[in-house]
Regions:
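Conserved donor-binding/catalytic core segment of Leloir-type glycosyltransferases
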Residues: 265, 306-333
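Carbohydrate-associated surface elements
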Residues: 270, 290
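Nucleotide-activated donor-binding/catalytic signature segment of Leloir-type glycosyltransferases, i.e.
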Residues: 360-378, 390
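Conserved acidic donor-binding segment of nucleotide-sugar-dependent glycosyltransferases
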Residues: 431-442, 451-456
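N-terminal subdomain of nucleotide-sugar transferases
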Residues: 2-7, 29-87, 92-94
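Membrane-proximal helix-turn-helix segments that form the acceptor-binding/catalytic region
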Residues: 185-203, 221, 229, 234-263
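Short hydrophobic beta-strand element within catalytic cores of glycosyltransferases
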Residues: 413, 417-420
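Acidic donor-binding loop of glycosyltransferase active sites
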Residues: 262, 388-403, 416
Length: 490
């Protein structure tokens, strides 16, 4: 039986990249209908690097370019958004509304106050919500997002809910035992109590909601996802996805949030399947988060080449956190050098996080200074333009956490091959432009690195595949699908 983690390298060598038509930026033609007034609710601080804030910023820009009105409700302070690293100043954009924000930080980022304070603030600022907005688009599951649900139900406004991430894994990875069980149970209880007034009005599992008949056509409905699943109580995969109380509690929270929406969006089919497996009954559409067209508007990526036994240039641009598994990848580099003393690399790290000190300590202990470049936080707009130039590979090392991995799409836009540990990410990598390790173990990634090191022609082949891929991951393509959903709900 073939290993689902592995990529057949012989097939890769013999394959021809799929050709695609040249992609124009902003190919959308405005529809001859009225512009929409969209309110986005998110608990994610938009000034930090990362897939969710990047996708929200790109979504806002694309919708506004088409003449739609977008208002974002999010946590933060004017001081936070004036940080030059963010280049996303709320003080300069009146359509970014900062909700009441707690004085403490959560994972280094601002977090909104209790939901009741957020709803009160919004109702005072917009006393006629139903006349101000056509629909709400919610991008998370915490206090501001719950405020969006409560207000939408109160004012009879349609809801689109994007489910971005595996909150069960975030708790499982980052919170130590036994506190993870307490934390997850507490979060789920608060979520349930806050939404209890509207939860009883939402459709129960198996209930035929008439809205489903009005939902997007089969191209966006992904009927094959529904048909491929057994009823949740019969499916043994549930035990694998939620083997602990903590993870089950977080799945309950995610499912509750999704089932209160009129339409659910996920960035990948594999995540959509998992949500339905756990009981999401609302229509789900798979729409990529997308990357901003402007990020690559003045950028001409080249085909990567790698010469025999030169240093392998590897780029990391993501959080330095446990769920992203930066330390296991550093261990892979150490093992690769141990297995092949002639293996040389230059590993560039862009990003920050709670594992920065451990990263620096590991690098000082095991690698020479020339092999590691720790750059910290770089303005997101500069990463693709300046820092991918001399790279051979991009790495995304998370496992069962990322639902899409925007890093993959950004690397693809640069024709930069991707190596990864999670076979679910194969769905995201365009046109066989990357390689997956045989397992998430550090040694498996080390073996993949050495395979590339000894077969340098793979870099050019992977890069050519990416160059020939259709650029459907651009926001200008994804926004067409999103607008179709909006139109059918509004």
């Amino acid at each position: 039986m073939s290993n689902p983690h592995s990529q057949n390298l012989e097939n890769l060598k013999n394959s021809e990249p799929t050709k695609s038509e040249p992609t124009q930026l902003n190919p959308i033609q405005s529809e001859p209908t009225k512009s929409l007034r969209i309110a986005i609710f998110t608990d994610v601080f938009l000034g930090i690097p990362g897939g969710i804030p990047s996708s929200i910023r790109a979504q806002k820009a694309s919708l506004e370019a088409l003449g739609h009105q977008v208002t974002i409700f999010c946590p933060g302070t004017p001081k936070d958004y004036m940080n030059p690293l963010t280049k996303f100043g709320a003080n300069q954009d009146p359509s970014i509304i900062i909700v009441p924000t707690a004085k403490f930080l959560v994972n280094g980022a601002p977090f909104s106050k209790w939901t009741k304070y957020v709803t009160r603030f919004i109702e005072q600022k917009y006393p006629n919500l139903a006349e101000t907005f056509d629909l709400f688009h919610i991008h998370y599951e915490a206090t501001t997002s719950m405020a969006g649900l409560l207000l939408a139900k109160k004012y009879n406004i349609k809801i689109v809910q994007t489910m971005h991430g595996r909150e069960d894994m975030a708790i499982a990875i980052n919170v130590p035992h036994p506190f993870k069980t307490l934390a997850a149970t507490g979060i789920n209880l608060i979520h349930h109590a806050t939404l209890k007034p509207i939860t009883k009005k939402s459709p129960k599992p198996g209930h035929q909601n008439p809205e489903i008949k009005k939902s997007p056509d089969p191209d966006y409905q992904n009927a094959e996802i529904k048909n491929s699943l057994q009823p949740s109580h019969q499916n043994p995969a549930l035990k694998n996805l939620a083997p602990t109380i903590a993870r089950r509690q977080m799945w309950q929270m995610m499912v509750r949030q999704a089932n209160l929406a009129d339409q659910v969006i996920t960035p990948s089919a594999h995540f959509a399947k998992k949500l339905q497996l756990f009981g999401v009954t609302r229509p789900i559409s798979v729409i990529s988060n997308g990357i901003s067209d402007q990020e690559i508007a003045n950028f001409t990526p080249r085909i990567r080449t790698y010469q025999d036994h030169e240093p392998l240039h590897i780029l990391w641009f993501s959080r330095l956190s446990k769920e992203k598994r930066i330390l296991p990848f550093l261990e892979s580099l150490r093992i690769a050098q141990e297995l092949e003393p002639n293996f040389r690399f230059i590993f560039t790290i862009i990003g920050d996080g709670n594992q920065m000190s451990k990263v620096r300590k590991f690098c000082r202990k095991h690698f020479d200074e020339a092999s590691i470049k720790v750059l910290g936080t770089i303005p997101h707009q500069e990463i693709l333009q300046k820092y991918t130039k001399d790279q051979h590979l991009s790495i995304i090392n998370s496992y069962q956490f990322d639902t899409q991995g925007l890093t993959i799409l950004e690397a693809a836009a640069c024709n930069l091959p991707v190596i990864y540990a999670d076979p679910d990410m194969s769905e995201i990598v365009p046109n066989h432009g990357g390689l997956c390790a045989k397992s998430p173990a550090p040694r498996a990634m080390a073996e993949l690195l050495l395979k590339i090191y000894h077969q340098p022609e793979l870099i050019q082949k992977l890069s050519q595949n990416l160059a020939a891929s259709e650029k459907t991951y651009l926001q200008s393509h994804q926004i067409e699908k999103l607008l179709k959903l909006y139109r059918q709900l509004s």
